[in-house]
Amino acid sequence: MDIASTESVSAAAGEAEKLTPCIDLIINNATTASADTMKELPEFNLDLIAPAVDVGAVGPIRVMKAFLPLLKKSPIGALVVNISSEAGSIGKCYRTFYLDYGTEKAALNMLTMTVRNYIKDDPNLNIICIHPGWIRTNPANTEAPLDPYEHAETLRRLFETKRHDKDGPVFVTHTGEPYPW
């Protein structure tokens, strides 16, 4: 599935409908990375921002829209989790780089909140965005404090508590604490 293509996402949803009567959980973890991500404004190629936002912010909402009929059929309540980042927090912004990635994640946060407002009266559907923390996912980040296997269990428990939590915060850390927009 090409998350940047509405046609591709719609086709994937159509295939899923042939295979299952419902979906209980969607985790959107799409992002882009470019050689310019770590560059500051004078060296940054601004043409990279729009594609980053299309993949990392619009893409997850594209997925939710296409899969909405299957999500609404969940017998246990469906949850959509959008993987954001502290880089998308405007209130915590300290960097002079990440012009593409930070913009993408800030846009994802806004779109998540807008969709949350739309589904607020649906007791069977919820959406959150999460800053997952720094995880040891490859040999390049051995200093990361979070073990991926332990972290997966922590996130599973968090997702279960957030499935029906319409009153709690929408942008949270991997421990469920509110994170500044």
Label the model's feature ranges.
Residues 13, 64, 112, 152-155:
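Short-chain dehydrogenase/reductase
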Residues 15-28, 34-37, 45:
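A glycine-rich helix->loop->beta "capping" turn
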Residues 79-81, 126-128, 170:
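Rossmann-like NAD(H)/NADP(H) cofactor-binding core
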